[in-house]
A protein has these predicted regions:
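Positively charged, aromatic-accented nucleic-acid-binding surfaces
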Residues: 1, 111, 116-134
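Iron-sulfur (Fe-S) cluster-binding segments and ferredoxin-like electron-carrier domains
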Residues: 107
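Short Lys/Arg-enriched helix C-cap and helix-to-coil transition segments
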Residues: 95-104
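Basic nucleic-acid-binding alpha-helical/helix-turn surface characteristic of O6-alkylguanine DNA
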Residues: 1-79, 130-134
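Residue-level detection of the helix-turn-helix DNA-binding "recognition helix"
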Residues: 89
């Protein structure tokens, strides 16, 4: 089972997938980068608190090319926007569980615990553009 996904920094040397699961993830990423409507089908190891699970489940319902705000997710699961943002920041499966589709009411918002322009927010921006959401 897949327990965590990390984005690699630019210029990281790539190496062949070490096992079946890594190969499946790599192939599914290739499909997603060709077509943002490609579906990830990977065995995920359930992690996180009950609240985090609710947030991550709600993000799964946000379709490709769409976004939802932290406040909208909070209202849906009877929580607060900051708690939703914290749960998104703790998401162990970025890309597969699409927390990049959750945005601030005032704009892009943070991504992977980063709330200032930087590496992860550049990824969020690219993903949303790739999916046609912005």
């Amino acid at each position: 089972m897949l327990s965590k996904i990390d984005y690699l920094p630019p210029n990281t040397a790539l190496r062949p997938a070490a096992n079946y699961l890594a190969k499946a993830f790599s192939e599914q990423c290739d499909q997603y980068f060709k077509n943002p409507f490609a579906v990830f089908d990977l065995p995920l190891k359930p992690l996180g608190t009950a609240h985090q699970q609710k947030v991550w489940s709600a993000t799964q319902a946000i379709g490709v090319g769409s976004t939802s705000t932290y406040g909208e997710i909070a209202k849906q699961i009877k929580s607060g926007p900051r708690a939703v943002g914290t749960a998104c920041g703790a998401n162990p499966y970025p890309l597969v569980t699409p927390c990049h589709r959750v945005v601030s009411a005032q704009g892009l918002g943070g991504f992977m615990k980063e709330d200032a322009p930087g590496f992860y927010r550049q990824i969020k921006l690219w993903l949303l553009r790739h999916e046609g959401a912005i």
